[in-house]
Every structure is written in structure tokens, then in C-alpha cells.
Amino acid sequence: MEDSEGTDGTDEDGCRAGGWFHVEAIITHGQSQVSSDEDEDETETREDLDFIDNRVPGDGQEVPLQLYAQQIAQDDEATVQALKRKFVASPLSACSCIENDLSPRLDAISLNRKSEKAKRRLFETEPPDSGYGNTQMVVGTPEEVTGEDNSQGGRPVDVREEERQGGDGEADLTVHTPQSGTDAAGSVLTLLKSSNLKATLLSKFKELYGVGYYELVRQFKSSRTACADWVVCAFRVYYAVAEGIKQLIQPHTQYAHIQIQTSSWGMVVFMLLRYNCAKNRDTVSKNMSMLLNIPEKHMLIEPPKLRSTPAALYWYKTSMGNGSEVYGETPEWIVRQTLIGHSMEDEQFKLSVMVQYAYDHDITDESALAFEYAQLADVDANAAAFLNSNCQAKYLKDAVTMCRHYKRAEREQMSMSQWITFRGSKISEEGDWKPIVKFLRHQGVEFVSFLAAFKSFLKGVPKKNCIVFYGPADTGKSYFCMSLLQFLGGAVISYANSSSHFWLQPLADSKIGLLDDATAQCWTYIDTYLRNLLDGNPFSIDRKHKTLLQIKCPPLMITTNINPLEEDRWKYLRSRVTLFKFTNPFPFASPGEPLYPINNANWKCFFQRSWSRLDLNSPEDQEDNGNTGEPFRCVPGDVARTV
């Protein structure tokens, strides 16, 4: 059959044309023939009159026209459906495309299909918008949009509108690859798509400033550690914000050293900041993210190296150039390591100064002394020299050992009245002696008899050196004894450690002792081995890694639920102990609040009130006997030499 003249309107071409047919009529005629369109002089015939629809509405011919319109609509819908079936990807193809977007390398080594759940894309190739208004962008990988005709394979390009709140300024560190097929930006895209974003930022920093970031800072593993000085490097900052940060940062800081560089990523802001108060990394990150209008992941934030001379010289030299903006007073750690006068002021560590500090603050624990003394490095030259030393552990141990020797010698030289005065001088609060007396009366203890026994107890009279408080549980025996022990700075021994040879060693370094909650087995042990201890006579104590020590037992208090006088097996202890019975439950004014509070201030007032009745020496008598009252000093004084 001979082909029809005009355009070949196949279904495929029709679909490509969007569902419309453009048919050209080719008419051949001789030169002598004239077409009806060209014959302008010919008069109109009756057939031409039907071209104009001049029928009267309502004559019954509307139904065929509506039917014809419906047929045309059905044909158009069928054409659209054919287009959809041709270009919409199949489920398998769509899943593979999603997995390819997630990780092309991972998809290349995959042996089977992965999960069909939609996942977040790791690598986006959309160009970052300006942040203002609605932005229409084309989403698709470079492989999907290659070619001149979008209908030639691949997935369709998804055109969408992204509504963004203008002015957020958040720009991603990804670069849109041009679709020209060139590899000019391929290396940059590969670098930015690396999984370790921090390594990428560190590499860019060294490229811009010529020095490693970690050569200027020290690392804080915890983001909750507070520090006043911070080094901040922010990437991809807008130009206007980078220029305005010089003014925006001033209300928050005392000192700022700001350097601004231009790179392929945009503006890079490098700052050394000293805040008005100490802040942690999380707080600094949120503050800088708000001021610079960038996400927190685009910043490197660490504290500076305070004892590194090269780092201090870097900040000092860059502050003198025209590429830095500096305001505020230079931090002392930079001044100390860069100026000659301050460098010569560094002195050697003196152990005696550290020992004096431990003695004055009553620190006999190595950990506590190390923590407290290290905090003085900014204001004390000897503490700074201690931190700069490589023998901190040795100095610390020696200082605590010497402090204990001084404290022990001072305690042994004091009488009980001097010791009570010394302990009372450490308490500045004013108390009341009445709660102690009321508590003893509440337990049925006669106050006069208690004072008489307490007087002999403090003097260490033989056979009167031990006081026992016994009675039912929850009567306040331990509460009463612990409060007195805390005021006098005594020691506690426990029968649970009786299997050790050294369980009595704490009594050698105290003026008073306490054995809490003695059981029947404990009383049997005391009756067997510790009769001489209850007498108040000298006895021998075994100390760890030291020779035996012969001392007089300090006054000892014992709390128990058993009356040792009622047991015949302990009859030899009856003359060695003084008993007071607590019978009534401990009174409370409210839950957790005792009715009769007994604290250090109340014990101080109690001893001042009953000083003469306890036959204690007055402070005036102590000064007359040679006690000058001057504080102990182990640091040699400076001698003024005349020229």
C-alpha cells in the first residue's frame, strides 16, 4: 500500500510530541490549475454557507456535540496514560536508583538487593540556595540528566519547590557538579564527600594558615569542660557576617584576636577568644553558631595551648600584622612566654611553700592538695612552677608527708584544753549549749554526773578513760558521739577490721577515739586483748610498714546495744568503763530535722560554758606558760640586706 502523504503520526511520535498531531496537507496541481483558496474572485456557493454556525440554540443538536467532546477527552486521557507508562520508572529500577544515591561504591559490591525502605541520601548534589525566598532547583545525579533529550532513558528529573525561611544563612559544604561532563571539580567533590568532615576542615585550615590546628590548641574530650579561653575556626561564613563579627563578639569577650581569610569555600574566620566567664564547648558552639549564622558542624572549637611557647609566639606575631583584628588586654599566658621581662621572672619550685599551703588549709590528702594547688597556677608563681615540673607526684607526696609530720607534732605538744581551744578557733559560728543538755535530760542522763565523768574522761584518768553509751536502737547514741568526735577531730575504729594487725593504728594520730556499735564478739575481744587500752595506760600499736609504737590510749567512746556490766563473762571490764544509758527514741521536730541539733557550734558553746567545771586550763594560763600563740611557719622569711 502506498504511504499516505503528510506527517507520519504514529503513537510513539505522538507521545513524544505531547499528545498533539500536526498534519501537513501536501497538494499537487499544475501550473494552470488554481486552488480554491487562491481564487479570490470566485463567488461564494451554498457549501460555504455551512461554515458559520448560525443555528438557533435549543433546536436539539447539542447532544452530538457533547458526545464528540467526551470522545476527545477520553483520547487525551489515553495519551497521557501512555506517557506515564513510558516514563515512570519501575519499582526495581527506583529501588536501585535509591541505593545508588545512598552509596555508589557500596552498591557496586552488593550481592543482593538491600532494604527497600527510603533512606536519607548521603550525598546531595543540589547547589546551595541564597537563603531568600522560594528557590526552584533540579534534583538529580549528573548521570541521570545527561543528554539533550530527557526522554532518552533514566529517571525523570524531579522539579520541586523548596520553601525556605530567608536569612538562615545555613550553607552546606557540598559543591554542585556541572553537567558539562568535565572533571574540573571532581577532586573537590570527592574531598567534600569524605566521611570524616573534621579531617577535611583540618586540612583546609592548614592549607590557609600554614600551621596545623592542633599545634595551637589542646584537645578537650568532654564538651562539658569549662574554660575561659577558646580557639574557634569557622568555615563558609558570609562576607557581611564575617566583617560584622568584630563588633558582635565584643559584648561576650574580654579579648579577641580575629583573622579572616577568603577561600574557595567562602570566608573563613579564625579567632582566639577570652570570654567574660568560663564556658564549655557546647555553649561556645551555640554562641558562635548564632553570631556567625552557620551550623555548628562547620566550626573547630578547642582551648589554646597555655604552656606552649611556639603557640604563644604564633599569636603574638600574627597580632602585630595587618591581617588580624585585636582588641582587649593580651592574656597573661601569651605575655609570660613572649616578653623577656616575664620570662626571666619564672622561678624554681619551692617545696616549703607548698607545705605551708597544705598546713594552713589543713590538707593531708594528696589528691586534694594536687587539685587545690593546681588551681593557683594563674596567680601563684610557685604553683605555676609546680605544674611545669616533671616531678609533680614526688613533690606532692613529700609535701603531704611533711604536713602530716608537722600536724602530728603540733597535736602531741598540745594538752586537751589547748586542743579544744585550737579546734574551737576554727569555728566562726555562734552556737547554743542548751540543746546538748536537753538531749541528755531527754535520755534520762543526769547532767551533773555526766559532767563529772566527762571531766575525768578528758583528763585521761586511769580506769576512767572509757565512756560507754548503751541502750536500744534509734536512741541517738551514735549521733551524740559522732558530733563530739567531729568537733574534737578524733578517729573511728571498727571491729570489722579486727582481723588486721593495724586496725588500732588511727588511735595513734588522734586526741579522742570512737568504737561504734560494739557487739558481743567485740566485747569478748576487748576483754581478751584490750583491757590495758581501756585503762588509759600506755600500750603498743602495730603500724603498717613501721615499727611498733608505744602510746597512751586517747579517751575512747563506745556505743553498744548490750550492757557489759550485766554479763558475768565480762566482769573484769566493770571497773574500766563508765556507762550511760539512752532509753528514749531520738526526737525529731520534722522529718529529717532533729529536735535537739548538736553540731560543732553547739559543742564550742558547751565547752565555753562549762570550761571551769571541766577543770580546763584557761587561754591566759597557756600564754603565761610559754605559748606565744603565733601560727606555725615553715617558710623561711626574706632578710632585708642593707647596701
From Swiss-Prot:
Gene Ontology cellular component terms for the protein in this record: host cell nucleus
Organism superkingdom: Viruses
Keywords: ATP-binding, DNA replication, DNA-binding, Early protein, Helicase, Host nucleus, Hydrolase, Isomerase, Isopeptide bond, Nucleotide-binding, Phosphoprotein, Ubl conjugation
Domain SF3 helicase positions: 445-595
Phosphoserine carried by residues: 90, 103
Region of interest (Disordered), ranges: 28-60, 119-179
Biological processes annotated in GO: DNA replication
GO function terms (MF aspect): ATP binding; ATP hydrolysis activity; DNA binding; DNA helicase activity
Catalytic function, reaction form: Couples ATP hydrolysis with the unwinding of duplex DNA by translocating in the 3'-5' direction; ATP + H2O = ADP + phosphate + H(+)
Cross-referenced Gene3D superfamilies: 3.40.1310.10, P-loop containing nucleotide triphosphate hydrolases, Zinc finger, large T-antigen D1 domain
Biased composition (Basic and acidic residues): 157-167
Binding site for ATP: 471-478
PTM statement from Swiss-Prot or TrEMBL: Phosphorylated. Sumoylated.
Annotated spans, DNA-binding region: 180-346
EC number: 5.6.2.4
Biased composition (Acidic residues): 36-45
Complex formation: Can form hexamers. Interacts with E2 protein; this interaction increases E1 DNA binding specificity. Interacts with host DNA polymerase subunit POLA2. Interacts with host single stranded DNA-binding protein RPA1. Interacts with host TOP1; this interaction stimulates the enzymatic activity of TOP1.
Task performed by this protein: ATP-dependent DNA 3'-5' helicase required for initiation of viral DNA replication. It forms a complex with the viral E2 protein. The E1-E2 complex binds to the replication origin which contains binding sites for both proteins. During the initial step, a dimer of E1 interacts with a dimer of protein E2 leading to a complex that binds the viral origin of replication with high specificity. Then, a second dimer of E1 displaces the E2 dimer in an ATP-dependent manner to form the E1 tetramer.
Protein name from the UniProt record: Replication protein E1
Organism: Human papillomavirus 57
